Amino acid sequence: MFADETGYPALRFKRFSTAWEQHKLSKLTTKIGTGKSKYKLQDNGRYPILGSTSVIGYDNNFDYTGDFILTARVGANAGNLYRFSGSVKITDNTVFIKSKYNKFLYYYLQKYDLKKLSFGTGQPLVKASDLKNLKILKPRLDEEIYRISKLLLSVDNLITHHQHKIDNLKLLKRALLQKMFV
């Protein structure tokens, strides 16, 4: 349920008024698992090898194809999320999720903070089996899911765009400082 104990979010798009439904994450996905790819890093490999936080290299073969939500399974990055689409290999220290609701679930899980699931004092660990049992609230209508996902993706794109501008301005400032204060 939401913070106010109802099935209704505090902020909605117009025309949507039905309560959201609660499901286990496993019921909203086609696959939640740990990567099992064996790989050989290739200098000219065609397919990305996805590690716990990003692409770690390339191989000439792939084991998985589709849209994925990924998180580190073990270590300091356990619970950090990223998305990837395409044909890939996925390492064994990475948990992946495939769903027709990938974008929505990506944003929902960011709010959830998967780091709360990690356990262990030395090396935090997030298990696929724990993810499967997460309770997720989702709109009943796919159109509402699509609109929420589209809005949040637009905000992410704006953030990325402005971050590039900030990075370029920092480079410009550094160059100006070097030239002005020789």
Segments predicted by a language model, with ranges:
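Conserved, well-structured core segments
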Residues: 48, 95, 150
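Short amphipathic alpha-helical segments embedded in low-complexity Lys/Glu-rich regions
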Residues: 45, 125-126, 170
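Amphipathic alpha-helical coiled-coil/heptad-repeat segments
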Residues: 1-27, 137-182
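Non-catalytic DNA-recognition/assembly elements of restriction-modification systems
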Residues: 12-35, 40-49
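A short secondary-structure junction motif
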Residues: 4, 112-116
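Non-catalytic beta-sheet/beta-sandwich ligand-binding modules that flank or precede catalytic cores
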Residues: 20, 24-25, 37, 49-52, ...
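A short beta-sheet element
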Residues: 51-110, 119-123, 127-131
